[in-house]
């Protein structure tokens, strides 16, 4: 619950910014990902339930070392599971691992994360690199970069 609360603080309330790649969101829950949810009227408690079921449980957060729970969960919410796993896989490989960077949180990735003892700061640095690369590819997103950068360092 504590980790979910921190993510909720970063996500804020209702937003429908046409320039935001997330589209219509409330508490970080996107209409595009959850078309059956009344996003505009979503309550904080409703968002917490979605976070727990869809982003925490389904993404196997607790299969990772506890030090990485918060950042992995936050990346799943903000960037999607596949990108989150790819960032962690790259961080493991940057420490001498040899994972296929495929975005799958399978037994080989889980074992390699544990074996490599990849540090939180290493994952943060790969996350910041992802955002920088994204803004390079899509300059229109530069207005979001500072917030993403700050979030990457705080989580």
Predicted regions and their residues:
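Cell-wall polysaccharide-cleaving catalytic domain and substrate-binding groove, primarily
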Residues: 1-155
């Amino acid at each position: 619950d504590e980790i979910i609360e921190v993510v909720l603080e970063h996500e804020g309330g209702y937003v429908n910014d046409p320039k935001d790649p997330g589209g219509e969101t409330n508490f970080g829950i996107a209409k595009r990902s959850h078309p059956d949810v009344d996003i505009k009227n979503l309550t904080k408690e409703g968002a917490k339930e979605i976070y727990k079921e869809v982003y925490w449980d389904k993404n196997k957060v607790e299969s990772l070392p506890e030090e990485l729970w918060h950042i992995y969960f936050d990346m799943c919410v903000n960037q999607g599971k596949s990108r989150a796993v790819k960032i962690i896989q790259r961080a493991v490989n940057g420490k001498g691992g040899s994972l296929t960077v495929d975005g799958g949180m399978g037994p080989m990735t889980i074992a390699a994360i544990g074996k490599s003892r990849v540090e939180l700061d290493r994952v943060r640095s790969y996350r910041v690199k992802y955002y920088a690369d994204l803004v390079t590819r899509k300059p229109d997103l530069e207005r979001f970069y500072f917030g993403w950068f700050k979030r990457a360092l705080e989580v």
